[in-house]
């Protein structure tokens, strides 16, 4: 596959802060701005300047997030084991979830090329109710439609959504132990 454009969020897998994203495009691909004004480069022009990158930078830049993403990317550049650690943590999460018959993983069966995010549904409970339970047990999860209602329509989990677990480079053994204890508690008290 030949990429012509790529869009990314700074806080997903790149370990940057919320509030920053980016895109790259192949030369010759014309993109029209969707937000206008405030470039400080050609202020008399009501449109956006033709000069890159200013054409796509309306308003003040989120300098703190830019610095945070830069720091994250610098840190990532020195990590040679990050993919191995994340894949191992993803496998461990799948093993733990798979031990509980009341949990059904949503998504592809072959998860070898997936990142450490796993969406589930629980027998007899809505995702929002499960989120409240996990909150009481001090386990951080996302619940509901997770900013992706069309994905949930495709997966058949709309309108309730799922419970989403995430693991990454910083997930440690005590996190997995706490999750296993929480899931066992939930299963025994259902």
What are these regions (language model features)?
Residues 1-190:
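Pyridoxal 5′-phosphate
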